[in-house]
């Protein structure tokens, strides 16, 4: 499963008797897994990801500014001024698209605050999924989460302020993977190279 591969890619001690919590935010899903002794002991998933953030930005710009923009422009807005929480030195962004009334090119100014509000519903669904997974995790692993923190991977994890938002709402420290985009791929590659040794773990990753 992807969370297991992400945990391996993040070099977490998945075979040790400690709780490892991984949050993998991809394009269409957010998966949260608690891994201990080589198995997944709690798993949560919700069908929202970074693509849904882009769609929310598109819908907001269309509804509030009468402007049609493409997926690539929405992604650029997310990267330039999108955030899950207020951040230092925020700046407005100039965005170009097609006026829905005249059909002509049009430029509007977007603020970080309005984009934050536009994507808040999606971000909240992501965070709530993490909260639910924490709630069903074995209680004896709670101390591990508090001392070692959770690990955030996946392209969607790069949204500014998301780690801080999860930490605020769960009261559990959040660590960003040094290679959030590559964690799953690195883990999958390690699994292929060591398939014989890891086969049993993946055959029974849900305990």
Identify the residue ranges that each predicted region occupies:
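Conserved phosphate-binding catalytic cores of ATP/NTP-utilizing and phosphoryl-transfer enzymes
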Residues: 1-23, 189-193
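Phosphate/ATP-binding catalytic cores across multiple sugar-kinase/actin-like superfamilies
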Residues: 3, 118-146, 191-194
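Conserved phosphate-binding/catalytic loops in two-lobed NTP-binding clefts
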Residues: 164-190, 198, 205
